[in-house]
Structures are given as structure tokens and as C-alpha cells.
Amino acid sequence: MSMKWTSALLLIQLSCYFSSGSCGKVLVWPTEFSHWMNIKTILDELVQRGHEVTVLASSASISFDPNSPSTLKFEVYPVSLTKTEFEDIIKQLVKRWAELPKDTFWSYFSQVQEIMWTFNDILRKFCKDIVSNKKLMKKLQESRFDVVLADAVFPFGELLAELLKIPFVYSLRFSPGYAIEKHSGGLLFPPSYVPVVMSELSDQMTFIERVKNMIYVLYFEFWFQIFDMKKWDQFYSEVLGRPTTLSETMAKADIWLIRNYWDFQFPHPLLPNVEFVGGLHCKPAKPLPKEMEEFVQSSGENGVVVFSLGSMVSNTSEERANVIASALAKIPQKVLWRFDGNKPDTLGLNTRLYKWIPQNDLLGHPKTRAFITHGGANGIYEAIYHGIPMVGVPLFADQPDNIAHMKAKGAAVSLDFHTMSSTDLLNALKTVINDPLYKENAMKLSRIHHDQPVKPLDRAVFWIEFVMRHKGAKHLRVAAHDLTWFQYHSLDVTGFLLACVATVIFIITKCLFCVWKFVRTGKKGKRD
């Protein structure tokens, strides 16, 4: 009997091992807003597969409440800011970025860098609060986590993994100029055919556009810095007790989960430890709330238009709101507008305002004809998933670039949010709704997205489990990470070969000169 029980317990353990990646323990360094939405989708799936997931959350976290019921565990660390103060700072920085004039390239990106550094100063204080919290660090050490999951644009996840001596996996949408992807991930982005992110170019560039792209590349390479590297390098060196850099620590990532895919991104080279998981949060539409469904059905054959500027922009100016409402009032479609502000005076009877909308469910509704979007990656992927053409009104960050990608693929029309007129918006809506080519292109992208051997979410979870099972994935990291910059570009080899060629040429020249001198001397002797 005891043998049978032993066998049964062994089978249960083996079942746990194979079905849920050894039932591992995952520590998460989270992000806010839409970044959290993507991470949480992965975390929920990990929990479903039997893993224990712990989120390291600050007491000022905005996007999640550690006290609400959840299948996730939260380890809360105290910070000097309150949730309200932190949220106000974020909103002010976002508002400032969204309203930046693009008069000159240099001025715009200098101010963007300043905004990013301001946020990173706050983040670095949070990080210092963690490492100085001996009780918390001891608890994390004793928890024996198997892997750290972090977003690469929010530093510290990699330092946490280094301190706990465990592997780590990155989730990343993009970094300005692909700086993180290139310097820490080792990815290649040839400027001749890959437009640098935030350039708003496509992969079909003219000569002048390639010149522009090269200028962007050089600027991001030698001037623009996402992080104040001196401060981060000093902080990491102090914590680890040895000279190091943020970039060097980030380069130790085992797997990079890039929230992109070829339905969205232009083709470029990849590496073995980089996996595209764009649209992992997308899912089939669920039924709408009764009142909303009745409004949608009342649209008849004309259908509906969905309008949202995302979660980070709560409202807009009264003047802009009236411009938009005036255009929406002139279309035959019904409109569901996510809007948190005073009701515009020009609002038409065909338009309803909502503080929140089930965006994915609306985009998946058969009566949806178009999506007016600020160009956030999550919203665009939901539109791709359901095959909905877009009118893009980008505001900041990667949004102009995202809309440029969709425009290049024939699935969107782009407008300038700050300067567009009612006529501009009206014409754009008529174009994407009435021109069948936009719907066809959107459906083509949708078919590409759905035609994958493994779903993006399953790929993401597989690689996290893979890292836990194998205690890392160092065998997938290219040796380029171990080379200096001059070795990587083969400058030492090139210099050596040039020296060899120069030496050979010198020796041959010297020999020829000696032969010539000898012959000349011989001829002169015969004459004498």
C-alpha cells in the first residue's frame, strides 16, 4: 500500500512538472497603465498553469490595488509619494509630452529626454527604497524565486535578478531609437531599410528619407539617452559593490519578449533569444452590456464608429472636443466615444459619451466600421485582431510611429490631433469607411495575425517556463555581448589586416627598391 501511495505522489509531482513548468515562482517588476495590461495578461496565464506569481508593487502604484482580491501575490514596499501624487506627476509628464511642439527636431527630442529623465529620477528613488529595505530584500532572498519578469523601459528588474542570482526575462514594446534593443539586446536595425522608431518613416524609403533616417540613427546613437546613464551606472555599481553599467546588466537578459509582430512591424533581423509576442492580450469579443448593445443595434446597416484616446489621456480641451463632436455628428454611423469631460456643445444625437468602454468587445462587434485611435499599441493590436480600419490621431511617444506603420500597410489614415479641422476628421472617416481597400487591408493584417503556429500568449508563457526549467537561456545569447565595441565591429581585425597588407606592401616596395638600386649600380659599373 505504501508503495502505491509513493507512486501516486510521484505521478502527481511529475504531472505538476510537465503541466506547469515545475510549478515555478515568478517575481515581477511591474509597470503602469498599458504596460501593466500586457504583463498582467501573461501573469494570469502563468497562474492558470500553476505557477506562483509575486508582484513587487510600490505603495503608490496606480494601475493595480494590492488590497483587492487577486490570484496574484503582491509584495508592497513603501515610498515617499502617495498614489495621488504619483498619478498627478505621470499625468503632468504625459500632458507635457503630448503638447510638445514639433517645430525643430533637436528641441523636441531634447525636451522628450528631459521628461524621461524626470520620471526616471522618481523611479530611481523607488529602487533605492527597495534595496535599502533590508527586511524586504531578505524576504525576497528567502522566497527562492525562479525568474524575474520585467519591462525593459523601467530599470531595476535586471538589478533585482542580479542580487537574487536568478535569470530574468524582459517584456518590451520599444525604446526610443531602438537604443535598448541594440545596446543591451544585440539586435540589428540596418538604417538602409529599417526606419528607426519615432522617425515616422516606412520601410519603403526614398533617398531623402534614408538620409533623414540616418540622421535619426546618429542622433539616438550619440546624443539622446533614455536614462541618465551616469546616475544609473553609479547606482548599480554601488548596490553590486563593483564597477558596472545599466546597459551591461540589462544585456544579461535570457529572453526578450517583444510586444510586436510582422503584422505591425517592418521586417528586420532577429536573434535566437528574441521572441515576438505582439497582440498577446487580444481575445475574441464578449457580449456588450445591454444598453450599449441596443445603441449599437440601432445603427442599422450604417454600423458604428469606436473612438478612444486611451487610458492616459482623460480629456481634451473644449475647443478640440467641439471640433471632433462636430465631425462625428455629420456621419451616418452611431459613435461610441470614450470621453471624460464636459459634454461638447456640438455633440450630435448619433454620439454617446462613456467614461469607459469595452474597447476589444466593441472592435469585435460585427457592426463596427472604423476605429478612431490615438495610436497606442494595445488598441492598434485589437483593431488588427478584429480587422478594423483606423483613423489615427497620435499624441505622443510611439503613437505617431504606430499610425505611420498602419498607414504604410494601408489600414489607416493619419491626422494631426492639434491642427485637424472637423472637415479633416469627417473626410478621414468617410475614406476608411467607404473605401473598401482599407477594410481589405485591415482584414489582411488580421489574417496574418491569426495565422501563427502558436498564439502569442502561449509563446510568451512557454519561454518564461523554459527559462525556469533550464535555469536560464544563456545558450541563446549571442557572443556579441562578450565583445568590446571595437571587437564587435571587427576594428581590431581590420586594423591587423591593414597592418599586414601595409607590411607586405612595404616589404615588396623595399625589395623592388633594392633590386632597382642593385641593377642600377651594376649598369653603372659596366659603363666604367
Curated annotation (Swiss-Prot):
An annotated GO BP: estrogen metabolic process
Carbohydrate-modified residues: 315
Gene Ontology CC annotation, any one: endoplasmic reticulum membrane
Lineage summary: Eukaryota, Metazoa, Chordata, Craniata, Vertebrata
The UniProt record lists the keyword Glycoprotein: yes
Keywords recorded for this protein, A-Z: Endoplasmic reticulum, Glycoprotein, Glycosyltransferase, Lipid metabolism, Membrane, Signal, Transferase, Transmembrane, Transmembrane helix
Membrane-spanning residues: 493-509
Gene3D superfamilies: Glycogen Phosphorylase B
Organism name: Homo sapiens
Enzyme Commission number: 2.4.1.17
GO molecular function, one term: glucuronosyltransferase activity
Location within or outside the cell: Endoplasmic reticulum membrane
Reactions catalysed: glucuronate acceptor + UDP-alpha-D-glucuronate = acceptor beta-D-glucuronoside + UDP + H(+); 17alpha-estradiol + UDP-alpha-D-glucuronate = 17alpha-estradiol 17-O-(beta-D-glucuronate) + UDP + H(+); 16alpha,17alpha-estriol + UDP-alpha-D-glucuronate = 16alpha,17alpha-estriol 17-O-(beta-D-glucuronate) + UDP + H(+)
Membrane topology of the entry: Single-pass membrane protein
Protein name: UDP-glucuronosyltransferase 2B4
PANTHER family xref list: EG:EG0003.4 PROTEIN-RELATED, UDP-GLUCURONOSYLTRANSFERASE 2B4
Enzyme class: transferase
Record function comment: UDP-glucuronosyltransferase (UGT) that catalyzes phase II biotransformation reactions in which lipophilic substrates are conjugated with glucuronic acid to increase the metabolite's water solubility, thereby facilitating excretion into either the urine or bile. Essential for the elimination and detoxification of drugs, xenobiotics and endogenous compounds. Catalyzes the glucuronidation of the endogenous estrogen hormones such as estradiol and estriol.
Pfam families noted in UniProt: UDPGT (PF00201)
The family this protein is said to belong to: Belongs to the UDP-glycosyltransferase family.
Signal peptide location: 1-23
